[in-house]
């Protein structure tokens, strides 16, 4: 070592050698030795078998990787961020997308059922049916109206009122 103001010129090879010397000294410390040996001595951990719910959830998550939902993941991530839920796990985002898709589908199906019952009740109460009404029910086209959507949303706990005036 240099002392008393001596000039030392160190080549890059010598500086690397001196750096590895210090690393070897660090490994010789008792703390580092215990960490090295702890990797070798793994305690026996008993694996707990998955319950049926956990195995079904794992299977669902694996199936979601290949499925592309109607609601894009980017839209779901944006809505989650605006609601204050930030996540980087794409599995959670995909699960929320599929859940939202099912919720919307359930509401649309309920509204369709309300529309069908409303139109059949109107036909039976009027007492007369024209040739147009005798079409096959599968050929009939239905239009989503507020009259059908409000009770469908009420079935799911969402209160919605038709505005009295349009501005």
From Swiss-Prot:
Family of the protein in this entry: Belongs to the TAF10 family.
Subunit structure, as described in the record: Belongs to the TFIID complex which is composed of TATA binding protein (Tbp) and a number of TBP-associated factors (TAFs). Also a member of the histone acetylase (HAT) complex.
Gene Ontology annotations for the cellular component aspect, listed alphabetically: cytoplasm; histone acetyltransferase complex; nucleus; SAGA complex; transcription factor TFIID complex
Protein name according to UniProt: Transcription initiation factor TFIID subunit 10
Keywords: Cytoplasm, Nucleus, Transcription, Transcription regulation
Gene Ontology biological process terms, A to Z: transcription initiation at RNA polymerase II promoter
InterPro entries for this protein: TAF10
Primary role: TFIID is a multimeric protein complex that plays a central role in mediating promoter responses to various activators and repressors.
Pfam families in the record: TAF10
């Amino acid at each position: 070592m240099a002392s008393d103001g001596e000039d030392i010129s160190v080549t890059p090879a010598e500086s690397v050698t001196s750096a590895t010397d210090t690393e070897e000294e660090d490994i010789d410390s008792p703390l580092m030795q215990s960490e090295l040996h702890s990797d070798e001595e793994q305690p026996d951990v008993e694996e707990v078998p998955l319950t049926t719910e956990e195995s079904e959830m794992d299977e669902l998550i694996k199936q979601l990787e290949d499925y592309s939902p109607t609601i894009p993941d980017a839209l779901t991530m944006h809505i989650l961020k605006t609601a204050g839920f930030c996540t980087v796990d794409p599995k959670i985002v995909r699960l929320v997308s599929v859940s939202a898709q099912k919720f919307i589908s359930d509401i649309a199906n309920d509204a369709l059922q309300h529309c069908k019952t409303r139109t059949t009740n109107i036909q039976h109460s009027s007492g007369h049916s024209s040739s147009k009404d005798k079409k096959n029910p599968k050929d009939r086209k239905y239009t989503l109206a507020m009259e059908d959507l409000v009770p469908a949303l009420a079935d799911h706990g969402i209160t919605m009122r038709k505005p009295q005036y349009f501005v």
